Amino acid sequence: MPLNRTLSMSSLPGLEDWEDEFDLENTVLFEVAWEVANKVGGIYTVLQTKAKVTGDEWGDNYYLVGPYTEQGVRTQVELLEAPTPALKKTLDSMNSKGCKVYFGRWLIEGGPLVVLLDVGASAWALERWKGELWDTCNIGVPWYDREANDAVLFGFLTTWFLGEFLAQSEEKPHVVAHFHEWLAGIGLCLCRARRLPVATIFTTHATLLGRYLCAGAVDFYNNLENFNVDKEAGERQIYHRYCMERAAAHCAHVFTTVSQITAIEAQHLLKRKPDIVTPNGLNVKKFSAMHEFQNLHAQSKARIQEFVRGHFYGHLDFNLDKTLYFFIAGRYEFSNKGADVFLEALARLNYLLRVNGSEQTVVALFIMPARTNNFNVETLKGQAVRKQLWDTANTVKEKFGRKLYESLLVGSLPDMNKMLDKEDFTMMKRAIFATQRQSFPPVCTHNMLDDSSDPILTTIRRIGLFNSSADRVKVIFHPEFLSSTSPLLPVDYEEFVRGCHLGVFPSYYEPWGYTPAECTVMGIPSISTNLSGFGCFMEEHIADPSAYGIYILDRRFRSLDDSCSQLTSFLYSFCQQSRRQRIIQRNRTERLSDLLDWKYLGRYYMSARHMALSKAFPEHFTYEPSEADAAQGYRYPRPASVPPSPSLSRHSSPHQSEDEEDPRNGPLEEDSERYDEDEEAAKDRRNIRAPEWPRRASCTSSTSGSKRNSVDTATSSSLSTPSEPLSPTSSLGEERN
């Protein structure tokens, strides 16, 4: 399968061009994951956003392999005929032997080609394949674990497909198979057991045991080296899943994780040190003018304000122009995602705002899907009352405007006492009476199935945040994914994030953390932790993260109570900022989006694939890593301009007010010469230092005789992680409460 294609990687703004060229002739990449065209969790986002940059590199020699789901195919995939003879013969052969294999194009940016394997249609072979798995790998799978049984079927079908593809190819290609997570890991183990000529990569985005242990309130990071992993997995009835994950990690030619914190975790729980850290990125959309994303923030905030007006009808005794919107979103893991810390910090923030007489109000929204049976009637009523008031106001306005127009048309000033009649006053009084409410605005927008034991609602009852008039912090729990068709809050997630002021993600277990990354590329400040992959990555690349709107909460070395106090300090400092300071901060945050662009982070995946090829085909490819100290990263320095770090923000002029305007639109009071947005942006761009990639390791193909350059493994880990990572055996502070 010849393919004459090379890739010249363009650089980020401020970075030198990365001039390595990869000769991809007769090389094919298959990326295997359960979440191909099948949205389940964060891996779907990784594959979806990375597809374009990978497709630009590999062209039509890049395929994604995933499970067939009727819903996914109906809404996301265009079914096509196989484009090559080898692939067509492979599909025909498998379909003729009792399998159902589909081929098409995933309708996302980049339009990658996908091979979808119908797991359910192959259930007839499950018992035979489970027996073969036991004979080959000594891994037994219980009958009651449907997810694990699906993983067995998917793994055998994937191996069958790869073996058939190699057999049907006239020119034997160099195949790279990249497997994501334990659900796809069986296929990797079988490829090695059957000695298929395939270069294999296994990426774990979060270890199974790590997620289970952290959910159980274990002092995880202080005891990594002390866990009896077999015992812990057995007690949680996931030993067979753990064996699948560990076997895949050990069988792979190259083992990668998404962050250094997960690399340390994998080294202790899976007993193999990752070869490369491959951070997760996003497709960054750059705006032609800085004010564009600021305008989007204002528009989205207006949508959220409409929802708040309805939700708090009858108790709307706070100024919406002086209201900040904080949010937390993600999988409903109360402790792992840090919802417990956030709620406690909100209670303390409420106390600080009240005793200091602050006019600022905070609305904290929890977007975490939970079990519900319907919308809360009181919440629906609030939105209905808001719409009724709006319609009443418009009706009166139209009548008033028509009478005013007719009066002016005849050349006389109107008699204001006759502009509104009794019917109008009656209508307005009825609208006012409709806003009367005896109870507090509801905390939860839905009826929960387990209201009495729900962790968020239980904690809210304990800390007493009931949305009373005296509270400066209001709480809204929205236990459902956001949708633009919702009758309550009709916005999608991206629009919602743009309308908020601060994302709060104080996670205890977060191998990467897409939610704060999404905030960053949209110019929204966020709070992360030094136990999340994203937090560690930004801490490594930015000298003073908080100055750029990335607050890093210390959950490594502090107790739970101290972490709550630090988070409270962050939140209170943010509340003290002026509108002008928040605008400047959002500008700085948005400029960090270059760090998270797949155009840059995709290089780590290139390096992993190159290493795998050299290990699987040493006679054709060589990978020569340079000395680890030859690679140097770069760091954004702390901005020198006013205002300084938001946590230490002070007024930049003696006459600061909330009415200050955007600093990009003209002079700003007396200190306008001290801050210029264009100059600030240029300075930040210059602050990006080009990574001094080591001398390129050669990757030589005997068929083409051309050099295949590669990036050193050490570079990948040194740029995405601290050069001297914290040893898991060292003390991480007080025990977690």
UniProtKB/Swiss-Prot annotation:
UDP binds at residues 39, 331, 515. Alpha-D-glucose 6-phosphate binds at residues 291-292, 294, 297, 301, 501, 582, 586. InterPro entries: Glycogen_synth. Residues 658-681 have a biased composition (Acidic residues). It catalyses: [(1->4)-alpha-D-glucosyl](n) + UDP-alpha-D-glucose = [(1->4)-alpha-D-glucosyl](n+1) + UDP + H(+). UDP-alpha-D-glucose binds at residues 205, 211, 331, 510, 512-513. Phosphorylation at Ser-8 by AMPK inactivates the enzyme activity. Primed phosphorylation at Ser-657 (site 5) by CSNK2A1 and CSNK2A2 is required for inhibitory phosphorylation at Ser-641 (site 3a), Ser-645 (site 3b), Ser-649 (site 3c) and Ser-653 (site 4) by GSK3A an GSK3B. Phosphorylated at Ser-641 by PASK, leading to inactivation; phosphorylation by PASK is inhibited by glycogen. Phosphorylated at Ser-641 by DYRK2, leading to inactivation. Dephosphorylation at Ser-641 and Ser-645 by PP1 activates the enzyme. It is an enzyme of class 2 (transferase). Residues 682-695 have a biased composition (Basic and acidic residues). Pfam families: Glycogen_syn. The keyword Phosphoprotein applies. Residues 634-737 are annotated as: Disordered. Allosteric activation by glucose-6-phosphate. Phosphorylation reduces the activity towards UDP-glucose. When in the non-phosphorylated state, glycogen synthase does not require glucose-6-phosphate as an allosteric activator; when phosphorylated it does. Keywords: Allosteric enzyme, Glycogen biosynthesis, Glycosyltransferase, Phosphoprotein, Transferase. It comes from the Eukaryota. The modification Phosphothreonine is found at residues 700, 721. Its EC number is 2.4.1.11. Pathway: Glycan biosynthesis; glycogen biosynthesis. The keyword Phosphoprotein applies. Belongs to the glycosyltransferase 3 family. Glycogen synthase participates in the glycogen biosynthetic process along with glycogenin and glycogen branching enzyme. Extends the primer composed of a few glucose units formed by glycogenin by adding new glucose units to it. In this context, glycogen synthase transfers the glycosyl residue from UDP-Glc to the non-reducing end of alpha-1,4-glucan. Part of the GYS1-GYG1 complex, a heterooctamer composed of a tetramer of GYS1 and 2 dimers of GYG1, where each GYS1 protomer binds to one GYG1 subunit (via GYG1 C-terminus); the GYS1 tetramer may dissociate from GYG1 dimers to continue glycogen polymerization on its own. This is Glycogen [starch] synthase, muscle.
